C-alpha cells in the first residue's frame, strides 16, 4: 500500500495522512477531494485497491490530477478548471480514450501526463491534443 511505501521511505506515521475515495479533506489549509482511480478493462489498478486521483482547490481554480486510471463511472463526474490526464496507454487510458474522457468532463485546460518514459510517446500527447474539442486548451509539457 502507499502507506507502507511511505514508511519504507522513512516517513513517520504522524507525517502520513491516509485518504479514501469520494471524500473531501482539508490539510494544512488546502482543500481537496479524492476521486476513485482505477482501470475498467484491465486489472493493473483494480477499483478494490481504493487508489485515488485528487481535485485540488487552489485560490479560485480547481485542478484534477487523475492518477493511473481509465475513464470510469466515478471520474466522468469530475468538474475542474485544469485536468492532468494520462495518455500513454497500457496501464492507463491511451490518447484516444483520454480525449474522449476530457471531452466529456470539459476542463478549460488539460495537461497530458504518463507518457514518454515507461509507456507512451510525445506522439501520443499530440494525437490526444488533436482529438480535443477546440474549447479545451492543451498544454504539452515535454
Q: Predicted segment positions?
A:
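Short histidine/acidic/glycine/proline-rich micro-motifs that form metal-
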Residues: 39, 88-90, 115-119
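Active-site metal-binding motif and surrounding structural segment of the metallo-beta-lactamase
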Residues: 1-17, 79-84, 106
Amino acid at each position: 500500500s502507499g502507506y507502507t511505501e511511505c514508511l519504507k521511505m522513512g516517513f513517520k506515521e504522524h507525517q502520513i495522512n491516509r485518504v479514501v475515495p469520494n471524500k473531501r479533506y482539508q490539510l494544512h489549509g488546502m482543500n481537496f477531494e479524492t476521486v476513485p482511480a482505477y482501470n475498467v478493462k484491465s486489472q493493473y489498478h483494480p477499483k478494490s485497491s481504493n487508489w485515488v486521483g485528487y481535485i485540488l482547490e487552489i485560490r479560485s481554480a480547481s485542478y484534477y490530477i487523475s492518477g493511473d486510471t481509465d475513464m470510469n463511472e466515478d471520474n466522468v463526474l469530475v468538474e475542474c478548471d485544469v485536468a492532468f490526464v494520462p495518455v500513454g496507454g497500457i496501464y492507463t487510458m491511451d490518447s484516444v480514450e483520454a480525449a474522449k474522457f476530457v471531452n466529456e468532463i470539459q476542463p478549460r485546460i488539460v495537461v497530458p501526463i504518463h507518457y514518454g518514459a515507461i509507456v507512451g510517446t510525445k506522439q501520443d500527447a499530440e494525437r490526444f491534443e488533436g482529438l480535443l474539442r477546440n474549447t479545451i486548451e492543451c498544454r504539452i509539457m515535454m
